[in-house]
Every structure is written in C-alpha cells, then in structure tokens.
C-alpha cells in the first residue's frame, strides 16, 4: 500500500511517499521539502498568512517531484495523509484541503495525522529504528514533552512544559541577543566559542520532583543579563549563548534520565528540531551509555517538520490496524486542530471525517 504524506503545519511544506508493504516498518520511497525560513526572516518570526499562501504555492509542485522521484503516479497512491494538527490553522487547512481534494478526485481515502506523532515516529525512518517500548523526549519549537511509548497509538504523558518550550527558549534567547530568525541554530553555533559556565542562569523546575519543564524564567534571566552587560554584550555574546544552551540542555538531560529511571525502560527516542542540538546529543549519549540505555534520533534532515514523518506515522498506523479505511472512503469533509495534545490522541483512529 502506497501512502502519500503532506505536512503544512507551520513554515515547512513537506511531501513524501512510503510503502507499507515493507516490514517491519514502511519504506520511504521519496520525499521533498521546502522551507520558508528566508521568507519569514525579515519579520523575525513566522507570519501565518504568508505561511499559508506559500504552502498553496509549493504543495502541488512538491507532490509532482515526489511522484516523479518515486517513479509512481498519483493513481498508484492508496491513501493520502495530511497533518491535521497541531499547528497554524491556516497552514493546516492548506494541507488538509489539498489532501482531501486529491483523494476525492482519485477516489482514495484521506486521513488526518497528529503532527507530534509524526515527530515521535520519525526515528523509524532511520536505518537503525527503535523497538517498543521506549521513553520519548519530544523537543521542538512549540512542544517539550516526555512520554512513555508502548506501541503505535499508545502514549502516556510523563511530563511537559508549563510555559515556553525548549525550542522557544533557544529562539527567544537568541532574539534577545540580536540574532536572526530562527535563533536556535545561530545560538548553538555561537555557543561553540563560548564558556557555558560564564553566567549563572536558572535551571527552572530542575529539582521539582516531577517531570515537568519550565523555560520562561530562563528567558527572563537572559534578558536581565543582556541588559546588565549593555555595551559589553557583543564581546560576551558567545559566553551568554553557551550559558543559555548549557542551562536548557542540563534540564532536558536530567529530566529525561529521571523519566528513564521512573519507567525502568532501556530505550530512549529523541525527536523534534531541538533533537538536532549537538550538546544535547552529546550529553544524552554519554549519560545513557553509562546506564546501558540505547538512544535513537531521527536523521538530521528529519528532525524538523517534514512530509516523511507524516507519511511514516500514517503508514505505521495502517500497519497496526488502527485506521478504519472503510469509514474514510467516499467522505472528504475535514477539520483541523490547531491545538491538539498527543496524550488525548491515544489510539483514536486518524479519520479525516472524525469530529473534534
């Protein structure tokens, strides 16, 4: 069975094709991605209206590229999957509308996919996929969560941020230091030349006794320190960047280790854009190696939003028998969910026609 996946939740347009006849997980046949970073950079962040319009321009040409690369036609596709949420409402509607229109024209079923489930299952796109069960650290621009994953569709929330996500802490701190959008990668690069112990920054909720996160206070501390430095900020920017990164990473690592200890699981999956951070990977790898825990990451190209993870999540749900294809056929109305907690999703079938 061929599954076409479309991602349009924020500022990347992604399309991919997977084959679910492969075992034990679907095989990625082709994928294409277009990033809107350059378009949003002058504004210092994502402009939702511009994002939606650009998705409209890109999604069909990318689909054509994917089908050509995979040496298939749209008529060969069995299921069309799209990101139903969470994300920007207008951007989500573009992907959902295109997916359901194509499905209706081809007489094929369309299914909505949870964006975070896509991130969670993205390591299955690698040559060394994880095995269930595992603890997952989901760290992106908008989400920071620790979850226990027993199988596809079975997710237990262990802890999450109560305010800013880790990715927001990176991006907002970078912006306070005068770095361009998106700030996180710029901050990480600058931190390579700095001293992570130069500034004493808070580690919010580090000793809270639970697995929740908080990064809003850290952002405030960075702002205070930047103002205190004044004209010296430019010469001390690398140190402040390194200290900020060290604070974020320490909290992520220690909370993750606590989750592994609490669940007694020996496998860890790290997914989402922040999962590409070199310091985070280095510290997690070292700590987990000492404890006999295997760590799995997506390939770097699949850390940020992409169509491959959406196609993979849909394909794995189909393989697990969690999707009622008969209920999808012949009805192409749809809705999107800009706010949608993965723990609410659980083993709910991803039906394009389901009500919110």
UniProtKB/Swiss-Prot annotation:
CDD domains: ASKHA_NBD_TsaD_bac (cd24133). It catalyses: L-threonylcarbamoyladenylate + adenosine(37) in tRNA = N(6)-L-threonylcarbamoyladenosine(37) in tRNA + AMP + H(+). Its EC number is 2.3.1.234. Substrate binds at residues 138-142, 171, 184, 277. Disulfide bonds: none annotated. Transmembrane segments: none annotated. One of its GO terms (cellular component) is cytoplasm. One of its GO terms (molecular function) is N(6)-L-threonylcarbamoyladenine synthase activity. Belongs to the KAE1 / TsaD family. This is tRNA N6-adenosine threonylcarbamoyltransferase. The lineage of its organism: Bacteria, Pseudomonadati, Pseudomonadota, Betaproteobacteria, Burkholderiales.
């Amino acid at each position: 069975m061929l599954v076409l996946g479309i991602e349009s939740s924020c500022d990347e347009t992604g399309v991919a094709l997977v084959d679910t006849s492969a075992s034990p997980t679907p095989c990625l046949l082709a994928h294409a991605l277009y990033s809107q970073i350059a378009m949003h950079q002058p504004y210092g962040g994502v402009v939702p209206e511009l994002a939606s319009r650009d998705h409209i321009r890109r999604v069909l040409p990318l689909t054509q590229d994917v089908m050509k690369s995979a040496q298939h036609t749209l008529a060969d596709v069995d299921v069309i999957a799209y990101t139903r949420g969470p994300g920007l409402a207008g951007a989500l509607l573009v992907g959902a509308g295109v997916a359901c229109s194509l499905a209706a024209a081809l007489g094929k079923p369309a299914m909505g996919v949870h964006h975070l489930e896509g991130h969670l299952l993205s390591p299955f796109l690698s040559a060394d996929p994880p095995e269930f069960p595992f603890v997952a650290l989901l760290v992106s621009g908008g989400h920071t969560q620790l979850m226990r994953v027993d199988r596809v569709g079975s997710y237990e929330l262990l802890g999450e941020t109560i305010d800013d996500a880790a990715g927001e802490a990176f991006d907002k701190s970078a912006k306070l230091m005068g770095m361009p959008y998106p700030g996180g990668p710029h901050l990480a690069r600058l931190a390579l030349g700095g001293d992570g112990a130069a500034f004493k920054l808070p580690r919010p909720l580090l000793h809270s006794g639970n697995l929740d996160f908080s990064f809003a206070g850290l952002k405030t501390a960075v702002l205070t320190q930047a103002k205190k430095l004044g004209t010296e900020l430019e010469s001390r920017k690398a140190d402040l960047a390194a200290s900020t990164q060290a604070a974020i990473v320490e909290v992520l690592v220690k909370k993750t280790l606590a989750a592994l200890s609490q669940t007694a699981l020996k496998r860890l999956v790290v997914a989402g854009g922040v999962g590409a951070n070199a310091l985070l990977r280095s510290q997690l790898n070292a700590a987990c190696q000492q404890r006999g825990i295997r760590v799995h990451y997506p390939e770097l190209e699949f850390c940020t939003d992409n169509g491959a993870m959406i196609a993979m999540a849909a394909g794995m749900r189909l393989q697990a028998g969690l999707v009622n294809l008969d209920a999808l056929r012949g009805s192409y109305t749809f809705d999107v969910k800009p706010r949608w907690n993965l723990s609410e999703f659980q083993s709910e079938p991803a039906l394009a026609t389901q009500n919110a």
